[in-house]
Amino acid sequence: MKNINEWHHIFKLDPAKEISDEHLDQICESGTDAIIVGGTDNVTLDGVLDLLSRIRRSHMVPVVLEVSEEETLTPGFDYYFVPMVLNSKEKKYMMDIQHKAIKEFIDMMEFAEVYFEGYCILNEDAKAFQYTNCVMPDLDDVKAYAYMAEKVFHLPFFYIEYSGAYGDPTLVKEVKEELQNTQLLYGGGIETTAQAKEMKEYADTIIVGNSIYTNINEALKTVEAVKGN
């Protein structure tokens, strides 16, 4: 299994969305470095467990649970990513939910498997932006959040999340220039190989999600586009 800092491509699956066994097998065998299980709406423990069991049935790809609600925490994942939404106006989305989850489930998870992410959501129309009550940052704000993620909180990841919309490559480039050790993740609106390549020029890791459900063939091509498999 690769170290996380060697991951270049991740698929993100929403346990509240339908995916056929055929498409799930294609995702798992695509050569992606990992699969994140996570979403915003209607995410339940049953949905998380069902998706995990379907992946584990015949695949060895690393699987990550993105912890947004403590009710969906369950053993069996290789890693747990805990988002801290830095541009939320509510402390609970940066600290309180995370604290509650760790307090309740710390004995269940090996701490080496738990990684905190500095999250910055940049799409005002996204459900995640509205759900976490975010404020829309400008470029200088985002660069400052990146600085905080690395220099203040010493987080392993800074995640630029456009959540369904394709983002600004120039912003991603400038944020990357602020980071030396923290790994830059980009997610949002990647639907083509050209977009995957463009964002991968600047981000350490790209995350492909929505296009799995809208155009599976193009989504699968993004793996080779950034990894050259």
Swiss-Prot record:
Q: Which Gene3D superfamilies does its entry note?
A: FMN-linked oxidoreductases
**Disulphide bridges, residue numbers:** none
Which biological pathway? Membrane lipid metabolism; glycerophospholipid metabolism
Q: Does the keyword Lipid biosynthesis apply?
A: yes
The residues listed in the UniProt record as binding Mg(2+), with positions renumbered to this chain, are 14, 40
Q: Which InterPro entries does this chain map to? A: GGGP/HepGP_synthase_I, GGGP/HepGP_synthase_sf, GGGP_HepGP_synthase
Q: Which GO terms describe its biological process?
A: glycerophospholipid biosynthetic process
* Organism superkingdom: Bacteria
Q: Which GO-annotated molecular functions does the record name? A: heptaprenylglyceryl phosphate synthase activity; magnesium ion binding
Q: Which family does it belong to?
A: Belongs to the GGGP/HepGP synthase family. Group I subfamily.
Q: Explain the purpose of this protein.
A: Prenyltransferase that catalyzes in vivo the transfer of the heptaprenyl moiety of heptaprenyl pyrophosphate (HepPP; 35 carbon atoms) to the C3 hydroxyl of sn-glycerol-1-phosphate (G1P), producing heptaprenylglyceryl phosphate (HepGP). This reaction is an ether-bond-formation step in the biosynthesis of archaea-type G1P-based membrane lipids found in Bacillales.
- Report the protein name in the record: Heptaprenylglyceryl phosphate synthase
> Gene encoding it?
pcrB
